[in-house]
Curated annotation (Swiss-Prot):
SUPFAM superfamilies (UniProt xref): CBS-domain pair, Inosine monophosphate dehydrogenase (IMPDH)
Pathway(s) served: Purine metabolism; XMP biosynthesis via de novo pathway; XMP from IMP: step 1/1
Source superkingdom: Bacteria
Species the sequence originates in: Acinetobacter calcoaceticus
Protein name per Swiss-Prot or TrEMBL: Inosine-5'-monophosphate dehydrogenase
Family according to the record: Belongs to the IMPDH/GMPR family.
Biological process terms in GO annotation: GMP biosynthetic process; GTP biosynthetic process
Amino acid sequence: MLTIVQEALTFDDVLLLPAYSTVLPKDVSLKTRLTRGIYLNIPLVSAAMDTVTESRMAIAMAQNGGIGILHKNMDIAAQAAEVRRVKKFEAGMVKDPITVSPETTVRELIAITSANNISGVPVVKDSKVVGIVTGRDTRFETNLEQPVSNIMTGQDRLVTVREGESKENIQALLQKHRIEKVLVVGESNELKGLITVTDFRKAESYPNSCKDDLGRLRVGAAVGTGADTPSRVEALVEAGVDVIVVDTAHGHSAGVIERVRWVKQNFPQVQVIGGNIATGDAALALLDAGADAVKVGIGPGSICTTRIVAGIGMPQISAIDSVASALKDQIPLIADGGIPFSGDMAKAIGAGASTIMVGSLLAGTEEAPGEVEFFQGRYYKAYRGMGSLGAMAGRTGSADRYFQDSKAGAEKLVPEGIEGRVPYKGPMGNIVHQMMGGLRSSMGYTGSAVIEDLRQNAKFVKITSAGMSESHVHDVTITKEAPNYRVG
């Protein structure tokens, strides 16, 4: 018997109604919850795709106030290294800096600094700071077998600060002594941390950046349900990851639910997101397993073919509403996929999402992985679904997401995505600016001062295809493309 559960709607089927407003777009707050314990300064998350998010994109996302989720289509060590790159890129204070002893040779020091991409190393003896050695000390040194004690800045010239010193005083000290690094010490001259002028400059350049309690940029990472997942999670947690995303095509499955439960039981300090799902029942199952947020979206992405190949899914607006209605604000939900315009972000939030995950919007940007290609007079970058043959073949991370065996050979894989190219878009910051500007406009139209106002108070109208045609540009030839509007 044919059972029709409900009529389902997506972004082009609805419009938000304007409301009385005293709110100006420039005055709204875009701060929102990613999970139970993590807040973002903008409601934007970059997708865990191998043509969208690696460390460079994750750094840029966090600097702009969002967060990037590192894809898992790489081995464990490589993914953990990507996490470390993000966490080490900026730090209010490096809590556990790499150190050397006075007896360490210059050759050994150079090897350490090269391997860890650092330029200044504290010199410690019996847990006490005795000096610091920087790139200036080693740059023209020819005797590589001598100890660093011969070339370091010793205690008599060493500039240090006590733990808890104000940012203003530290900046004044750096400027007064014309130095780029200062050591933080305790009452007995024991090393507490390292502060660099570079981190101050980064913080000033990106005042809206999303950081943890130690002043480091936040980053997430995707894992699956395969046999190597426990080792992968352990390595990611050790590297300092802020959030683990148990990322599969079908989040309402026993393996995903048990993996979410396992991560929360073994690493309770780490936030866990489960997905992808499209129903309220799935959301409640993941909530019961301990998920700190859920990810909603089966098949809405521009490169996803799940709805056609498997005949499975739910139009995204209805999926978001179904999950939000079931969760009743106990944990946040992330709307994942099908977002070509900033107005769709506003619709997703109005339907119940707290954050938006995007892939195609950020694919083709300078920060996205991959080389720029020249084709028929235009520049492009590759973009593919994680369910495409290219992503799954020979890479266990992506095949695992779709519950398939990459070792079976490409001819045995059943793809649920395609491979393609998108125009090169330049720096991602320009796109984020336009998308968040559109969201601000929507909040102004609806009288929403904060994201939660839009989530709770939005009202929709259902429209026809004629209504959507009327909404788009019509009866005119575009002569100059707008930065936030592209059709086709």
